[in-house]
Amino acid sequence: MRIALPGLFDLQVNGFGGIDFNAPDLTVARATEALERMRGTGVTRCLPTLITSSFDRYAASARVLARVSHPAFAGIHMEGPYVSPEDGARGAHPRADVVPASVDDFRRRQH
């Protein structure tokens, strides 16, 4: 029996197939490769995720992802840095890189 389903939409993807969307050596080509390989698993749309990290690291990854042009790419999921600084609630996010949410900081991370 064959079953046809719509493609899956993954809302949080840190990387795929050994390609980390937060890695310092991320390139548009590598990000595109990860997205293309994900399609083979049934994921047809996704949000590559940026984790809490230093401003420079975060902004560099955002700049790379912003240049990706692939049908699976639906935008960027920002996992931090706007999370609780409290132990427990903060989870694995590095305390040093957690910042209070502000429109100015949000805009700076996108340029």
Regions found by a protein language model. Give the residues of each.
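Divalent metal-dependent hydrolysis catalytic cores, especially in the metallo-beta-lactamase
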Residues: 14-20, 32-61, 72-84, 111
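Short capping/connector residues at structural and topological boundaries
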Residues: 24-26, 87-88
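Metal-coordinating catalytic core of metallo-dependent amide/deamination hydrolases
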Residues: 63-111
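N-terminal hydrophobic or amphipathic segments with adjacent small-residue motifs
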Residues: 1, 9-12, 69, 74
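Di-metal (Zn2+ and/or Mg2+/Mn2+) metal-binding site signature of metallo-dependent hydrolases
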Residues: 3-25
